[in-house]
């Protein structure tokens, strides 16, 4: 006897990044519990729980993170650039309204942290329904949060930040402007001479369509540009997801696990015990690419 059960479409969340088109696997999550469904000034917001993934946030029909694997995304995008820089003092995250990047960044002995987020309602929703993601980071006294367009904000700064994390949504809706050439120019103008930036890009299946072209744009500003690999089981890519690391002066490939381990112990001390995914070995392995994905 078959265990297959036919369910109503209303009981499922089906991700539709490209309407009517699926280049990756079909992502359908059973909605076991509706938490919140609404619309901000900028985007649709959906919070629900799904068996095996826990609580999930979707914006404009696209999964942003799930409770089961958000730590992978946030630890990689925060610690890889911060650990690559020898003396980071000022840190900026563009986007990241859920607070996950900040949760990881505040573990470092930074002098100042900044966040610019266009959608204040997303921050409020995440504080209410996903307090475990920010982990109290919004209360850090070193942090300044600004609600405005990321490009407008970053244009105010020159040679100021050692590390910038661009944790934007995908290249649709409010995040579209953060995938254009003018924005990249602004990012590198805001970085110090030895500054490092990392950008959320997408699945490696988009390598030829998106990732390779963005790497070319970044090479106009940074001496070292390299993809960063990470697994994201809750994303439509299935597993292989891509960030892009861009460094003006420091070669990320020359950092050994020994050097990274020393920095980790010195900077995070006992806080390193809270890490679930990042390690010096993971750091180094995340930069290793097959030939087809090298830029």
Residue positions per predicted region:
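The AdoMet/dcAdoMet-binding core of the Class I SAM-like
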Residues: 2-13, 17, 65-196, 205-212, ...
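SAM/dcSAM-binding transferase cores
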Residues: 2-46, 237-295
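Short gly/ser/thr-rich secondary-structure transition/capping motifs
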Residues: 38, 145-148, 228
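N-terminal glycine-rich anion-binding loops that anchor highly charged ligand groups
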Residues: 45-53
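A general beta-strand register signal
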Residues: 58-59
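Conserved S-adenosyl-L-methionine
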Residues: 222-233
